[in-house]
Amino acid sequence: MNLKYYQVDAFTSEQFKGNPAGVIFSDISDTVLMQKIAFENNLSETAFISKIDNEFYIRWFTPYCEVDLCGHATLASAFIFFNYIDSNKDIFIANSKSGELRVIKNSSMYYLDFPIDELNEYKNMKLIEEVFNEKPEAVLMGRHDILAIFNNENIIKNLKPNFSLMCDIDVRGFIASAES
């Protein structure tokens, strides 16, 4: 099998800086094969972009699993698209498990448009107060993360989270925020 593989350093214009990602434009649809390639690449993510009926589809793999969304590998894929696939375009659109993603090229700048994560009120305020050892003003739940909003940035600076309790809650992560 012959594949054209690119490695791109996202978020930088300097070689060996930024966040590296593997990029493969191919019609591979075999999930097991994509996982094996990502494992061998051993980068935080490898993006696989296929074209079906004039639309691009993107999937991302860490060395160990497929992920639903990856910003830097999407930017890396757009860079390859603009520079090696179709240099006449200034927008790269790809469908993913997280929805439609767009990268817009304006001169040497790239703008990434990700789907909005819908936030809903999180009902168990007491639990989040225990997690942060501080009472938040509001708590919202996104697709994978809990967002706790506090009164001011000094509260954020002095938070003493209960990391053991965090690990017991089935979410990807916690975000503490305040107006600064």
Regions found by a protein language model. Give the residues of each.
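Active-site proximal loop and beta-alpha junction motif in alpha/beta enzyme cores
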Residues: M1-L69, A73-S180
